[in-house]
């Protein structure tokens, strides 16, 4: 993988002696790819790219976004109208969010239709389903952050859904809202979930997903 000029350098030799870089590189580049693999097997990778775009653009917006009920909408307007390329960053964030959901759905269909969920890949499928739930949760929590009329009522409806669950429903609603009604605590919790909890969960499950795919390989044709 590496040229002779690189492998002969002292820097490379230093890392090779400690980490066996060449063995790692050979393992990555020599993995067998079945001949039946086509463009539809790239849908999972495209979903990953969308997630990375989401992470980068979302991180950029945290420098300007203010998660308070009085300033959230104003800060979003500021990002769109005053920040250099802010309109582009937020637009890319929204577009890649929609693309991520679409690619995730298509990826799930591809795996199901080609039997990629069958033994011995059941755990890979389960982890993938968990990531699908996390992806939808990203959309639900992110939708509320501008705190406009659409965001407010979306939060009110979504956070009220668990009330239908027997015994623990009301407690779950109060946990989501941070109180009896939707307000500042609700926005703070949704912001924390969207920018901290869900990204970490997604990163952990993605790592597990990729390690299992790496170990088991790509599923064969039907």
Swiss-Prot record:
UniProt record similarity statement: Belongs to the cytochrome b family. PetB subfamily.
List of residues binding heme b 1: 107, 209
A Pfam family hit: Cytochrome_B
Sorted UniProt keywords: Electron transport, Heme, Iron, Membrane, Metal-binding, Photosynthesis, Thylakoid, Transmembrane, Transmembrane helix, Transport
InterPro entries: Cyt_b/b6_N, Cyt_B6_PetB, Cytb/b6-like_sf, Cytochrome_b_N_euk/bac, Di-haem_cyt_TM
SS bonds (residue pairs): none
Cofactor(s) of this protein: heme b; heme c
Assembly behavior: The 4 large subunits of the cytochrome b6-f complex are cytochrome b6, subunit IV (17 kDa polypeptide, PetD), cytochrome f and the Rieske protein, while the 4 small subunits are PetG, PetL, PetM and PetN. The complex functions as a dimer.
Gene: petB
Binding residue positions for heme b 2: 93, 194
Entry-linked PANTHER family: CYTOCHROME B (PTHR19271:SF16)
MF term (GO), any: oxidoreductase activity
Transmembrane annotation, as ranges: 39-59, 97-117, 123-143, 193-213
Subcellular location: Cellular thylakoid membrane
Residues at which heme c binds: 42
Function: Component of the cytochrome b6-f complex, which mediates electron transfer between photosystem II (PSII) and photosystem I (PSI), cyclic electron flow around PSI, and state transitions.
Single GO BP term: photosynthesis
Cofactor note: Binds 2 heme b groups non-covalently with two histidine residues as axial ligands. Binds one heme group covalently by a single cysteine link with no axial amino acid ligand. This heme was named heme ci.
Further comment found in the protein's record: Heme 1 (or BH or b566) is high-potential and absorbs at about 566 nm, and heme 2 (or BL or b562) is low-potential and absorbs at about 562 nm.
Gene3D superfamilies: Cytochrome Bc1 Complex, Chain C
Taxonomic source organism: Gloeothece citriformis (strain PCC 7424)
Gene Ontology cellular component terms for the protein in this record: plasma membrane-derived thylakoid membrane
Record protein name field: Cytochrome b6
Membrane disposition: Multi-pass membrane protein
């Amino acid at each position: 993988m590496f040229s002779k000029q690189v492998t002969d350098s002292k820097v490379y030799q230093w890392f090779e002696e400690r980490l066996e870089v060449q063995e790692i590189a050979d393992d990555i580049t020599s993995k067998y790819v079945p001949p039946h693999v086509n463009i539809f097997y790239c849908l999972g990778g495209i979903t990953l790219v969308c997630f990375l775009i989401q992470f980068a653009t979302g991180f950029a917006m945290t420098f300007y976004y203010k998660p308070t009920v009085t300033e959230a909408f104003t800060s979003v307007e500021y990002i769109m109208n005053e920040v250099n390329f802010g309109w582009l960053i937020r637009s890319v964030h929204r577009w890649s969010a929609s693309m991520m959901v679409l690619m995730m759905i298509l990826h799930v269909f591809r795996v199901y239709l080609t039997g990629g969920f069958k033994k011995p890949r059941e755990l890979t499928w389960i982890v993938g389903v968990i990531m699908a739930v996390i992806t939808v949760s990203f959309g639900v929590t992110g939708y509320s952050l501008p705190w406009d009329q659409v965001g407010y009522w979306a939060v009110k409806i979504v956070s009220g859904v668990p009330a239908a669950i027997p015994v623990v429903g009301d407690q779950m609603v109060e946990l989501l809202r941070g109180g009896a009604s939707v307000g500042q605590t609700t926005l703070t919790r949704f912001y924390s979930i969207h920018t901290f909890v869900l990204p970490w969960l997604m990163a952990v499950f993605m790592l597990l997903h990729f390690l299992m795919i790496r170990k088991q390989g790509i599923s064969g044709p039907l």
